[in-house]
Amino acid sequence: EEYLLIDFADTSQYLSAQNFTDNVINVAMPSTYRFLEKVIDEIGRMYQDAGVELPAFHVGGDEVPEGIWEGSAICRTFMKEHGLTKIRDLKDYFLEQILEMLDKRNIQAVGWQDIVMNPDNTVNEHFRNSKVLNYCWNTIPEQGGDEVPYKLANAGYPIILCNVGNFYLDMAYCYHVEEPGLRWGGYVDEYVTFDMLPFDIYKSLRRNLKGEPVDVKTASNGKQPLTKEGCQNIKGLSGQIWSETIRSFEQIEYFLFPKVFGLAERAWNAQPSWALSSDNKIYMDAKRKYNAGIVNYELPRLAKRGINFRISPPGIIVRDGLLLA
């Protein structure tokens, strides 16, 4: 019972995004916090033994389903003892404890955007002055998520942009039925990663979830703009590749290359010249130059090293009743 994470008498009914009904720990139990301290300290010792610093610790915290803890008598008693009025106040309390644990150990706390957002996608002001670094992943326009990064940055929260629509590298390259990868966040190829604009995020996706073209000139209409102060809170970019559907390292290489070149390009040059111009020709010229670098230099280099990568299949187009290759 020293590291027990769940209340066996909890009758809460919920379903997570992954269709789990029991994947949330009970934050009202002292054993939960003993477990967390144990994990943090054990990982810290691994770094210490290796002679390197543990600079940051990612606490996760995303996609916590509605309905958790509602059937836990332990949680209800805990709320009364600590003056908490809403179930979601437990989440704030939990995060406070983790932040304190990490701060005492001089470790930067990192988490997904969900931990500092309210269920209605508004900013949770409770953590405005916290030191947590927030990874913004759920930025799908159709779900209203594309405004979240700038909401947080403008409110003073430091963020890392890891947009699912641009930087989730386990997404399929295209919508073809035989193309491996997930599709819930759209498709991601080497051009979608290249298109990411940290300081003009609404222009980062040129197609919607259905694969239909997006007018980038009007994509930001009515959306939260990034302020001058908010710009200072964008601390970096991150690409993710989730492995639950990947069965070999060769597959990992397939998803990484050539997608990752766009991530590297944008991390190196966060505000390319074409982003500041309304002339689409400038963008197309930059895209052609980028593609030429991949085809003429990067892919041959990977091939020499025996690294697996994806080559786009031949393309066709129907124009004026003719099939052109």
Each PLM stretch: what is its role?
Residues 60-63:
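Glycine-rich beta-strand-to-loop/alpha-helix junction loops that act as flexible
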